[in-house]
Amino acid sequence: EEVQPLVVDNGSGMCKAGFAGDDSPRAVFPSIVGRPRQQSIMVGMGNKDSYVGDEAQSKRGILSLKYPIEHGIVTNWDDMEKIWHHTFYNELRVAPEEHPVLLTEAPLNPKANREKMTSIMFETFNCPAMYVAIQAVLSLYASGRTTGIVLDSGDGVSHTVPIYEGYALPHAILRLDLAGRDLTDYLMKILTERGYSFTTTAEREIVRDIKEKLCYVALDFENEMATAASSSSLEKSYELPDGQVITVGNERFRCPEALFQPSFLGLESVGIHETCYNSIMKCDLDIRKDLYSNIVLSGGSTMYPGIADRMNKELTSLAPSSMKIKIIAPPERKYSVWIGGSILGSLSTFQQMWITKQEYDESGPSIVHRKCF
């Protein structure tokens, strides 16, 4: 009986984990590690020194929460190890020494980071084999393509990644440090201007929920602002956990507008549409046409209604007039990185690509640069 490889997509905001060959991840939980703020007074109550994921989230009142992945890149390896441990033993309930593990990484991830991931998998978890794949490339595979440009926008970072025949083109990858977490913060700010106060980490989670349920991208921002000012047709109400009902109006589209106008957040960078265009312009003339007609959206921050139409409109005005532009926004794009990993990990042709424990023992962590690219 073939052993199912494990697929773990470690995002800045959520960790997605499951088995290769499945069509969706078994476990999706926040990439959070929480530690008690005070020494526990309840001795012997089985209080742990750290909590991961949903449990950390539900006890957030008494914990200080840390995200070990910032802007898509692991910055705290001790906490990262806790997240992986939790993934294998508590969420998937598997023994990592019995399964090959496919991990994902951000584009342009530092070399030292890939090596560290590799050594933790083999030395801490004793995996028989592992592989590290670039997130955006997996999203493209999940859409059934090998050439295209992926706009991957999650909780911690956004990237535009041009891919030609299965290989990312590193010189043309652009990173934008503007993603879901920034949009949540921005929504907290503009709701505060409306007179609602959201300040604590616990309240931030409420605002994130408001964002996910009520926000959308306007096709024409100025028009939408005028509509919102002259009528209440765009207003929606939202019930807070304490029963208070708040009204949200133009905040619904002002929040994600920051993706197109980062100046809203006080950032000097260009929006996602222009970043995408700039990425394409860094590529060879001959492949641009293929990129323009295969623009694939991926990640949770591309889930806003209206985002594909707006991208199409903005890119049409930037690109040469005869250019055919196609934005692909798969309904499952929140998990398309994981789905791509599941597809890759279950291909028979992929099985010789794994880095084995034996190869690691012979060559050390640098093997990852030779086998995963």
Curated annotation (Swiss-Prot):
PANTHER family: ACTIN. SMART domains: ACTIN. It is found in: Cytoplasm, Cytoskeleton. Pfam families: Actin. It is an enzyme of class 3 (hydrolase). The keyword Cytoplasm applies. This is Actin-6. Actins are highly conserved proteins that are involved in various types of cell motility and are ubiquitously expressed in all eukaryotic cells. Belongs to the actin family. Gene3D superfamilies: 3.30.420.40, Actin, Chain A, domain 4. It comes from the Eukaryota. Its EC number is 3.6.4.-. It comes from Dibothriocephalus dendriticus. InterPro entries: Actin, Actin/actin-like_CS, Actin_CS, ATPase_NBD. It catalyses: ATP + H2O = ADP + phosphate + H(+). CDD domains: ASKHA_NBD_actin. The lineage of its organism: Eukaryota, Metazoa, Spiralia, Lophotrochozoa, Platyhelminthes. The keyword Cytoplasm applies. Keywords: ATP-binding, Cytoplasm, Cytoskeleton, Hydrolase, Nucleotide-binding. The gene is ACT6. GO terms for molecular function: ATP binding; hydrolase activity. PROSITE patterns: ACTINS_1 (PS00406), ACTINS_2 (PS00432), ACTINS_ACT_LIKE (PS01132). GO terms for cellular component: cytoplasm; cytoskeleton.
